[in-house]
Amino acid sequence: MKIAIDAMGGDYAPREIVKGALLAAEQYRLNIILVGDEEQLRAELGRSNAGGLVNIVHAPEVIEMREHPAVAVRRKKNSSIVKATQLVRDGEASALVSAGSTGAAMAAALFGLGRIKGIDRPAIAGVLPNEKGLTVLLDAGANVDCKPYHLLQFGVMGYLYAKKIFGITCPRVGLLSNGEEETKGNEVTLAAYHLLQKAGINFVGNIEGRDLFNGNVDVAVCDGFVGNVVLKAGEGLAGALFKIMKEEISKSWLAKIGTVMAEPALKGFKSRLDYAEYGGAPLLGVNGISIICHGSSTAKAVKNAIRVARESVENRLLEDIRSSIESIEVKGAGGNLVQEID
């Protein structure tokens, strides 16, 4: 399996991207294609023993965070994210991973790979830790404004993602709202509620913010505006908890002694809240596997994002989404949504 990596995208590119790619190549025995400035990439590879698992595709241009995504993707045909996407489109790579501009990664995927038939809006599937495991959250930032049938499509794709990648037999799908009652929500969520009821997935109804973290659902559906706010708030809360904990521990020598005793548990706690453990989030709904990473991804996060890409390919996630969406014709509010999803 070959995975294309946008080696120039991210706050710590190309060094951390290359390090993460090498870790993944060695651990998962994958063929990695690093896409970016060849001179810089060879310099980074010179610091390690890359072996025969890594190749370079030269891409002299980089799309910066401040650039307009769609305009930049059209103008910079030789940028690392565009070149990496083309490798997937042309069948030279099975998936791509990028820690660069989320907007550029989305635009490159839409222009280069296209949408799956029946999907109007691709969605980013983020992951949040909960008391019992994790919650898939989508959309996590791709679509600020959504129609009811967009949320329906997100629910179907999230259901399949949780089932295929996380091994959940019958994922519970909830619609994020301001109350559990069927009558709660705005015009969009009220309409989406009834569409999701008929979609042939395990829809459990409306959920509230606390349900994202108590393990009552496996998939939470919302628009990209709400999803991105939730995701960033979760990251901020996790960081604040660690800082508060450190401050409290530093106030007492007894607490410091207790910390030594509790070190294994604290490490486990930190690991569960660390976004790097989950790697990247797939852009579901495009005709290819595209994994989007946090802009500040370290080598560990990049390695785990590549793992997500590998698992998505091995579990035939794209094929399952395509066949399921087409079979139930999730094309709009008036679609036929009575067929069960296997």
UniProtKB/Swiss-Prot annotation:
Group of enzyme by EC: transferase
Q: In which pathway does it act?
A: Lipid metabolism; phospholipid metabolism
User: Where, subcellularly, is it found?
Assistant: Cytoplasm
The regions listed as transmembrane in this protein's record are none
Q: What is its EC number?
A: 2.3.1.274
Q: Which InterPro entries match?
A: FA_synthesis, Phospholipid_synth_PlsX-like
GO terms of biological process kind: fatty acid biosynthetic process; phospholipid biosynthetic process
Q: Which UniProt keywords apply?
A: Cytoplasm, Lipid biosynthesis, Lipid metabolism, Phospholipid biosynthesis, Phospholipid metabolism, Transferase
**What Pfam families does this protein's entry cite?**
FA_synthesis
Q: What family does the Swiss-Prot or TrEMBL record give for this protein?
A: Belongs to the PlsX family.
Q: Which domain of life is it from?
A: Bacteria
Q: Which HAMAP family match?
A: PlsX
Q: What job does this protein perform?
A: Catalyzes the reversible formation of acyl-phosphate (acyl-PO(4)) from acyl-[acyl-carrier-protein] (acyl-ACP). This enzyme utilizes acyl-ACP as fatty acyl donor, but not acyl-CoA.
Q: Which reaction does it catalyse?
A: a fatty acyl-[ACP] + phosphate = an acyl phosphate + holo-[ACP]
A GO molecular function term, named singly, is: phosphate:acyl-[acyl carrier protein] acyltransferase activity
In the UniProt record, what gene is named as encoding this protein? Answer: plsX
An annotated GO cellular component? cytoplasm
Protein's name in the database: Phosphate acyltransferase
Q: Indicate the quaternary assembly.
A: Homodimer. Probably interacts with PlsY.
